[in-house]
Amino acid sequence: MPLVAPSLLASDFLHLADVCKMVNESEADWFHLDVMDGRFVPNISFGIPVIEWIRKAAKKICDVHLMIEEPEKLTPAFKKAGADTLIVHFETCRNLHSNIQQIRALGMKPAVAINPHTPVEMLQDILPDLHHVLIMTVNPGFGGQSFIPHSLEKVREMKKMIAQTGKEILIEVDGGISLENAPALVEAGADILVAGTTIFHDKDPRQVIHLLKNSKPESWRKAFLHIRDFMRWLFF
């Protein structure tokens, strides 16, 4: 059963207290918080003051995703703001190993994100030092984009690389995650589903979280359909 991390960037910030309450009371596992600087990605989102406020309201893990240049300069500030896990981008770090050591030394769980064009092999050397890996399944910076199908193969490749380390390293996916593609992602090896638009643009976000949480691998679904069809043939 995957972990579900609602991305608050897609939520209604006018009612952020209600959003936090809903996530707390739902089957969601983490809060996913996207920080954008307008340089590494085109958009600017929110920063440390908003994370501090969310941290006060959140009763679950705060997974902070830094889409910013020179993340090492602000790492201590994000720890102080309340980040439990801190994700930096491979593409922005000049000294990735040092960044990871810094995050861990401050008491946070380190993670690295890779953009759609970045091969998973680029993380081979740093992989044993990570708590999880974030595979971007859209180009970062904007919500509501369409899922990139090739991402499934990247998840499979990352799963194989992790198995070779002998460590328990989680795979997180973010971008265009929906009820339709979640089962295939889980089957490929995804452990954490980040979803924003899919959850917060629905009339019943709690139900969407429930359905994502209960995403079954595609092979399970096909087996169920075969059994169902056989039972119908047998008894009707």
Question: Model-flagged regions — what are they?
Answer:
Residues 218, 222-233:
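Targeting/processing segments of secretory and organellar proteins
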Residues 91-93, 115-118, 138-141, 197-200:
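Short, acidic/turn-prone active-site loops that include or flank metal/cofactor-
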Residues 1-87, 92-95, 102, 110, ...:
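Conserved N-terminal beta1-alpha1 strand-loop-helix module at the mouth
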